[in-house]
Regions:
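Conserved protein kinase catalytic core
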Residues: 27, 62-63, 102-105, 136-137, ...
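Regulatory, non-catalytic segments
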Residues: 212-216
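Membrane-inserting effector segments that mediate pore formation, membrane fusion
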Residues: 217-233
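Conserved G1/Walker A P-loop phosphate-binding module
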Residues: 1-64
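Conserved C-terminal guanine-recognition region of P-loop GTPase G domains, centered on the G4
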Residues: 49, 72-158
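Short, flexible loop/turn segments with low-complexity composition
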Residues: 196-211
Length: 233
């Protein structure tokens, strides 16, 4: 049975790997602390308890070269899907992870998301607000995400859900902890969107192949007259 695919994407240090481990129910993805990411290539994770595969990505970094490296890694994975026999790698749902403690979502992060997933123009997106330790701030963070995407109307239509999540127990102080929360809701939301995502993945992949054929055809047509002119007496 073909598994669907969920792409997990976002800035370095937002907690993508911790989120993946929480969804899998075991420590599989390498985790770290601070703003430096721990994933240096795309990794695929499966579990018998999940109907979908999870694709972890390289986090977006502030520097241009590292940012482009992360974007190009996703684009390369996506283009591999167009090869014969690789269609089961198509992306069906995207989890865009945002740090709930930062209180900001910069347009650049959304732009990086758009560039990296440009091939998947109609695939549904769930914005996952990680590290949502403060319950009172969750509503503010949801509004923050809504406002940030409002300025990116072309991509905003793909955002289907915004979910605050606590992926691992977090110590607030000596006597208080933030318990894991929102993981079941995230899995349920993903499963609900998957029928739409499966159709979107097939459509986007077909459109990519069609556009590539057109580009190749234009390239050949454009080349022949030049070749003819060069060899004509």
């Amino acid at each position: 049975m073909q598994r669907s695919n969920v792409l997990v994407i976002g800035n370095s240090g937002v907690g993508k790997s911790t989120l993946i481990n929480a969804v899998l129910g075991e420590e599989r993805a390498l985790t770290g602390y601070g703003t430096k990411g721990t994933t240096d290539k795309l990794e695929s994770y499966e579990s018998d308890s999940l109907p979908f595969r999870i694709i972890d990505t390289i986090g977006f970094e502030p520097t241009f070269l590292k940012e482009m490296s992360a974007i190009n890694a996703v684009k390369k994975w996506s283009k591999e899907c167009a090869k014969e026999g690789k269609e089961d790698n198509q992306i069906n749902v995207i989890w865009f992870c945002v740090d709930g403690t930062s209180r900001k979502l910069f347009p650049k992060a959304i732009e990086s998301l758009c560039k990296a997933t440009a091939m998947w123009k109609t695939v549904p997106v769930i914005v996952v607000i990680t590290k949502s330790y403060s319950v009172p701030e969750r509503k503010e963070n949801i509004e923050m995400v809504q406002n940030a995407f409002a300025s990116q109307k072309k991509y905003a239509k793909n955002v289907k859900k915004i979910l605050p999540v606590v992926a691992a127990t977090y110590e607030l102080n000596e006597t208080a902890f933030a318990a894991p929360e929102g993981i079941t809701e995230l899995i349920d939301a993903t499963n609900e969107l998957m029928p739409e995502g499966l159709k979107a993945g097939v459509l986007d992949l077909a459109n990519f192949k069609l556009n590539r054929k057109r580009q190749l055809a234009h390239g050949i047509v454009g080349y022949e007259p030049v070749l003819y002119l060069n060899i004509a007496p």
